[in-house]
Amino acid sequence: KLIHQTLNNLSLIASQNQNSADRFIQLGAQEDKVVNAGNIKFDQNPKSDLLTTKAIKKITQGRVVITFASTHSGEEVQIINSYLAVKEQINALVVFVPRHPERFNQVEKLALSAGLSIERRSSARSATQADVLLGDSMGEMMSYFEVSDIVFMGGSLNDTGGHNMLEPAALSKPIIFGPNVFNFAEISSNLLNKKAGIQVQDSKQLFTEIMQLLNNPEQLESLGANAKQYFDSQQGAVKRIAKIAMDII
């Protein structure tokens, strides 16, 4: 009863998606006071830094790039083991960008112990002969996305709940994610519905999908284009919220 009264003391509730709007109504908010205004994250319009992107391109030297972004402890081991099983069939550079900087050295050791050759972004050396490039830099994620042919969003093979898929979507990148994406449930569902993303259940299926995409350039391009189209279609939340606020004032 208390939350019912509190919600209805508000002039209006602007939610970021329909699921949230429905929950407010279930909690007792009057239907005419709840509006789905959209998610302001879509209005950020993320872009990569040109100089940083150029520097990373100099390292990758035009190779096919598969980026595993914002990975967590336990995920890299799964990814490396599954990669080793199909390594001879994939002519691509694997890029790891761990979520937490304190794990850079740990991920390097994992790769080396698996017999993989590795270069670090910080060395600025060419990765033409390397199996793995370690993204041991801060604030450069958009540039890693920019040079990627395929992006896997980490935090989704463990119980973290996934990470922001909108950034690679804004850059027209094909996006793959694991089974656990509860932090981005609606966005991941929309990406799947729009044929703008692929969900896998484990790292073995992840590399099955990667090989399928690399052997099917049309599907690869279509996934990226659909991701960008979805991102663009969701923009405008800031303007909608501003108009709502002005109407109330």
Task: For the regions a language model picked out, list residue spans one by one.
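Nucleotide-activated sugar donor-binding and catalytic core shared by glycosyltransferases
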Residues: 1-249
